[in-house]
Amino acid sequence: MANDARPLARLANCRVGDQSSATHAYTVGPVLGVPPTGGVDLRYGGRAGIGRSETVTDHGAVGRRYHQPCAGQIRLSELRVTILLRCETLCETAQLLRCPPLPCDCSTPL
């Protein structure tokens, strides 16, 4: 079932602060201690930390940075991942999830 094709899920409610129409950088990393599933559990990190979860489908790779419009669609690999919004929250969210340290590279404009 690793290659099971499913319809894309739209990233909803991904507004961060007043950036209602901005393009955000999504950095994908694994959530430790959770086995792979048929879907992907998305945890949105923002100014308030970790938010709600939604399920999307496969394609892509852990560690890849995605640049998509906030209301756009995104494909991810079939495992539990974390979507982190806003570069400045990347390391803080990773610590909350007890993930390995992640590089906080803000050289790419959001």
Swiss-Prot record:
Phenotype on disruption: Deletion mutant shows increased production of SMK.
Source taxon at top rank: Bacteria
Gene Ontology BP, a term: symbiont-mediated evasion of host immune response
Induction: Part of an operon that includes stf3 and cyp128, which are required for the production of SMK.
Functional summary from the UniProt entry: May play a regulatory role in sulfomenaquinone (SMK) biosynthesis. Not essential for SMK biosynthesis.
Protein name: Uncharacterized protein Rv2269c
